[in-house]
Amino acid sequence: MPLITRRSLIATTGAGLAGVGLAARAFGAEKKHKIALSNSYIGNKWRIEMENVFKAALLMEPFKSQVDGSWFNSGNDVSKQSQQLTNLIAERVDAIIIDAASPTGLNGILNQAAGRGILVISFDNIVTTPKALKVNTDQVKFGETLADWLAKKMNGKGNVIMVTGVAGTSVDEDRNKGADNVWAKNPGIKVVSRYTGMWDSSTAERNTSSVLNSLPQIDGIWCQGGTDGVLKAFLAANRPLPPTAGEAENGFRKFMIGYNGHKVDGISVGQPPFLSVVSLELARQILNGSYPKKDITIPFPYVTNDTVKVGETVFPDLPDSFFDDFTDSGPNAVLSLCEQAALDGKACTGTLKVTLPAA
């Protein structure tokens, strides 16, 4: 898709279909698996990238020859997502991969899917039913990592703001739990404000602006997402930029390299959008009988001021809202994706290799 604003991409519902290619014996597929992505929320750039890399993967081998893929958005509405899942069960899909609107509210319908022989894989905002496999990073550790770094930078004392995520999701709950674990060990740190940023830069900027004038000196920022928006609100209020622990937004990392003339000391931890592709690969391999039914935890990528690198982990020419962890890197990379896959869902050149943990 063309590069357009976040607001124009926010939608309460959406559906796409991708029937890509014919079965190819070279990739071991005699029939194509019907695999559907059920996404609860499309209101930020991370979710858009997550869907885009899923779409791009469907256009690349081995998925092109082995998978008929579809994707659906429910506007963060549990009832609507449940109805879409009901429709997928009726369509007799082979697998459902889901980024859920609620950790518990969809368990019943997902149990029905599993009872009909449909493979269910939950990623990012996972569900609690044991009938669904889980693909994720360690979200409690995510929150702890941000808070640990911040506590050290603040020498264990000072005022912190917490910018949280989408309420009611497992990711939001677990990240907050991780941070609170660290604050409990550092009684000198006071959380002076806790409010949602919805994992969205514009929302985080607006909500920060609305509370900032009433707050005392802020010595640290802990932010689940929308980090660059929080920093922009500080600049607009003529506040100094304190040490900041946040997500993998390109705009935040631009601040970390001082690209805009304002440099911040930070740690940027990423929840990789390619979790959708890892889930797709897990489904493909299980349906092919080449991988066991098991949960997968992958490491989350992160950078500090010492390790952030232009052209690899920050991109000055891309929008601030772009999430830089769209691909993995290094000798043990889970996968490698091109920028266009994340920007508009276009295929990268060559075959897409996704490395799952040892079975």
Which stretches of residues belong to each language-model region?
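Short amphipathic alpha-helical segments with coiled-coil-like heptad repeat character
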Residues: 1, 17-18, 63, 151
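N-terminal secretory signal peptides and thylakoid transit peptides that target proteins
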Residues: 1-16
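N-terminal signal peptide c-region/cleavage motif recognized by signal peptidases
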Residues: 21-23
